[in-house]
Amino acid sequence: MARYAAGAVDCPGSPKSVRIVVVGDKGTGKSSLIVAAATDSFPPNVPPVLPDYKLPIEFFPDGIPVTIVDTSSRPEDRDIVAEELKRADAVVLTYACDRPETLERLSEYWLPELRRLEVKIPIIVAGCKLDFRDDNNQVSLEQVMSPIMQQFREIETCIECSALKQLQAQEVFYYAQKTVLHPTGPLFDQDSQALKPRCVRALKRIFILCDHDRDGALSEAELNDFQVKCFHAPLQPSEIEGVKRVVQEKLPEGVNERGLTVTGFLFLHALFIEKGRLETTWTVLRKFGYNNDIRLAEELLPSAIFKRAPDQSFELTNAAIDFLKGMYMLFDDDQDNNLRPQEIEDLFSTAPESPWKEAPYEDAAEKTALGGLSFDAFLSMWSLMTLLEPARSVENLIYIGFPGDPSTAIRVTRRRRLDRKKQQCERKVFQCFVFGPNNAGKSALLNCFLGRSYTDNQESTTDERYAVNMVDESGAKKTLIMREIPEDGVQGLFSSKESLAACDIAVFVYDSSDESSWKRATQLLVEVANYGEATGYEVPCLMVSAKDDLDSSPISIQESTRMTQDMGIEPPVSISSKLGDFNNLFRKILTAAQHPHLSIPETEAGKSRKHYNRLINRSLMAVSIGAAAVVVGLAAYRVYATRKSSSA
């Protein structure tokens, strides 16, 4: 199980090339080191800065193209060096063994400078000119570098070399390349001396994929299948027994009567890494499609399936929904239609992290009394992620075990523009933009949509927020996504021509007891309607008269009714979040969204534009009819003339 397969670098996620940038003080031997490593000889004369040097593919056993970039030490070239560092995969930082001040400059200038530039890549420290070091100053490399490496954890390794004596010059770049192909950082925490969480999650997923009979242990046959997949050679029975014995001696629960448990599997990889055999763990990860970030490589998520027009969206397919239903039942241990937070964490334990722990997903769905998710809420969360981040949704479906082709997990909907023309919609997921002035009741509306109790101390939000839930409509459940747009976020929304393309319906909430709130909501309605007319992404709209439990402004009632009639949309829907009276609002929103040709407001500018277009069309029609009459007249005249000529 510890054999290394060089072919692993050909797997998805493997770096396809390595770019190494060499930096350090003037006169520390940067250029000489590069030439000595590349040509196996010492150069008597080298230019101040070498051109980029490409090593042959066969130079190192991994067969990865390596480019070495020399840099200038002149202060005026710092910007150029900084740009090269930002493009690098690894850094070789040099000092001269015969000049102690260049060693001091590593921690005084170079390493802090790399941090300032946010160069988050492996660093190899190379002590050059080893042959020039004073024989009376034979301090060990470990003694010199240990304090620096404790302070700067980004240093992967240190090595002393001599270009003149051809001593370890090539090894400097071999180690640099190795830190790119098999970095320690993503796998192992040096402080805690333990595997990092993301590495544990990836290895757990690999274990589950290899545990074909799902009995929680890798049998001898399953271990051999794993070995052949990763290392192209089976294990001998004695080797399998040796692996089990090593694990059992250190971790008894790592082996049971059925084979190697997941705990034992993780222990083995921690052991490989502690012994410096990172290539073993990286080979396994690469074979299962992981990149250096311990995420699935982009090649495994074909970008073609995520192409769409701005007014199209993505939804889960029936195959994905059936799979998610099965996963929900599997992790809902007591089958009480309540997936508890820990059960959700267990579900995503084979993903790099739980995708729902941060905005916009955190608190976006209705919770049960125990803080969990019902199946409807669980599926709603997946629908929200599929609409907002389809690639992330598919990626997480793969992490939790979706068995089919990723392209069968989601489907692209018909264009909304075409829905309006056909006057019908086949969508199952609808997005509603919620506009309104501050303190109008938008946040309270979203909270109540999620079944949460009303509170008088509801704080206004300055950030966009999502709420998602299922709504029953004519005996069928549809998913409604409410997107709250803060008042000061409206202009930012309009910075993109396609900002309304993803909107199925817009609602405008105002405080019915505050005349200024109604006026501002009306302004927002006109702004959105104007923008929709100008960009071609017109959307159905509804006005929502909130806080109906308070005394309504008489002017607001009269004017809002007149205004909605003038614009050709439904009268405002009165609601009270405090009293829990929503007047079937969410069903009305869904109904309007499913009839995209109705409830579209017309502004005065829009009416004028349509009137103008009708006049133009009539004029063109008149011209066409007149032209047709002329053509018919000419044809009749020619027939008449021909007959007259014949009779003569």
From Swiss-Prot:
Effect of disrupting the coding gene: Embryonic lethality between the apical 2-cell and the 4-terminal-cell embryo stage. Impaired in pollen germination and pollen tube growth.
Entry binding sites for Ca(2+) 2: 332, 334, 336, 338, 343
EC number(s) given by UniProt: 3.6.5.-
Membrane-traversing stretches: 620-640
Mitochondrial intermembrane compartment residues: 641-648
Segments in the Cytoplasmic topological domain: 1-619
Domain Miro positions: 15-182, 427-595
Sorted UniProt keywords: Calcium, GTP-binding, Hydrolase, Membrane, Metal-binding, Mitochondrion, Mitochondrion outer membrane, Nucleotide-binding, Phosphoprotein, Repeat, Transmembrane, Transmembrane helix
Membrane topology: Single-pass type IV membrane protein
Listed GO MF terms: calcium ion binding; GTP binding; GTPase activity
Residues with Phosphoserine modification: 14
Domain EF-hand: 198-233, 319-354
GO biological process: embryo development ending in seed dormancy; mitochondrion organization; pollen tube growth
Keyword Oxidoreductase applies: no
Protein purpose: Mitochondrial GTPase required to maintain proper development, morphology and intracellular distribution of mitochondria, which in turn are essential for the progress of embryonic cell division, development of haploid male and female gametes, and pollen tube growth.
Family indicated by similarity: Belongs to the mitochondrial Rho GTPase family.
Protein name: Mitochondrial Rho GTPase 1
Organism per entry: Arabidopsis thaliana (Mouse-ear cress)
